[in-house]
Amino acid sequence: MKKIINKKSETFLEKYLNNASPTGFEWEGQKVWLDYLKPYIDDHYVDNYGTAVGVINPNAEYKVVIEAHADEISWFVHYITKEGFIYVCRNGGSDHLIAPSMRVNIHTKKGIVKAVFGWPAIHTRHEKEETPSMKNIFLDCGVDSKEAVEALGVHVGCVVTFQDEFMIMQGNKYVGRALDNRIGGFMIAEVTRLLHENKVKLPYSLHVVNAVQEEIGLRGAQMIAQRIQPHLAIVTDVCHDTGSPMMNKIQQGDTVSGKGPVLTYGPAVQNNVLNMIIENAENAKIPYQRAAVSRSTGTDTDAFAYSNDGVPSALISLPLRYMHTTVEMAHKDDVENCIRLIYETLLNVQSGQGFKYF
């Protein structure tokens, strides 16, 4: 198959991933995303909380959404000791176990303040070692008093992110923090580029949505779903690659990097939409995998599905290793196949198409 991702695409991806977009503070990353999207869309807008939307064929009555979320997990400055050490609380599902020895950026009005998560040296720890927890992990920004910390511009409520570093391993693995889910934002942007470059005339209005605040409860998607009131929503997010060590396939399912997009079965996923996507995958010879969820998908799919009296929705997921770490890893072939599958599905959606079961 012809490759989709080009040099310009990967330059955008690197810039986008290396630009912090913590939950509730997504706007700098959203600017990067929207600037890339603008040549390929007819209109765009941003809502009050920062969700960005590009629109193709805005005057059509039938509305289709393709969606990803823009925010990343992070921390808040929570307490500053008189000695200048900083304790944090979570902003989203940040992992305390990986924090010790990590370098971070504290975002202040004066600019970025560098700091590290400190941890006692191995020589000094007792036989019964403490494990990292929210009670004992702390930041050190190289000063020795609360007043010195505050003089840097750091205060309670400042957001903290792990330092940026995107890389490509072995030519086909994307690695870095915040692939969950800015890689999704990248994928829907590439779908939009393909539609433009291939001069596709859609018979409906396409809303390309990069939602905020997914990591703390799908909040951005809830807001924008009410505003758009779409007739169909195709959501993309990441799921666990269960092929690496310490993963239990009996509990987590069998979804592996390099074997294609993952299509989810669950109550929020409208089966006629899912079957349409599967049919498009098979017709276009796009590999795919299956997953099942017992209740919610845990993604913005749920927010769209249960909005506006029910929006037919489906989820296309990218297998991801080491989720919510600084070394999240995705296979480039899977990224391309997710893009391809969304694109092929959009080509086969008809204006006015209904999805009721009977």
Regions found by a protein language model. Name each.
Residues 1-358:
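N-terminal hydrophobic/helix-forming segments and targeting peptides
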